[in-house]
Amino acid sequence: MGDVRRGAKSNHLELRPMTQLRLLGLSGSLRRASNSTAVLRSLEDALAPKALLDVFSLHGLPLYNEDEDGEHAPESVRALRSAIDTADGVLIVSPEYNHGMSGVLKNGLDWASRPYGRSVLRGKPVLTMTASPAFTGGVRAQQQMNETLASIPARPVLRPQIVIGGVHEKVSDGRLVDEATLRFALAGVDDLLEEIRAARFVRAAA
């Protein structure tokens, strides 16, 4: 699909080649052998050259403190906000801890949600996934993630939830090796890419 632009001397919409879309990946787990990160890395490999997925680590973020925000926000926070701002869309994969998203992910979203009303996530297309050893796949965490994103307000992709149950049996050597699950996840990313293209089309046609 191409970029849609108006001709210089008419209102005719011209279809031009679209540049490679850039996605930012956020993992809700800090573990070295994180299953959530393994899913992201596998999608990173599978998406090329259709889209570029950069995985950003939330490891260095301090706990959210409004006193430390603003003009002199920590460098790691500024880096996160910049990475989100320059991405066309965001892909989040998180485990489920105690029926909710991980604390590190919630903390990252809290930092990214500020400044209020001017968040870099505002209107940004976001796709969420959860991965868990449990057969439920972290579905309760995903509901919480989408509620938080909608409140910012980001633009969560409206589609059937992508939950990966029994993930510990589907990951090996830091990669998602279950082909059916990988195809399932890639279908969701395709929907994210379509959401991004649709938003571009609306802006170009305005």
Positions of the model-derived regions?
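A generic structural motif
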Residues: A48-D54, A154-R155
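Helix-loop-strand module that forms the ligand-binding subsite of alpha/beta enzymes
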Residues: H72-P153
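N-terminal beta-loop-helix "entrance" segment that forms/cooperates
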Residues: L58-P74, V171-S172
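Short, Lys/Arg-enriched N-terminal segments with co-localized hydrophobic residues
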Residues: K9-P17
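N-terminal beta1-alpha1 ligand-phosphate binding loop
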Residues: T19-A48
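Glycine-rich phosphate/pyrophosphate-binding loop and the adjoining helix
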Residues: M18-L24, N65, R155-A206
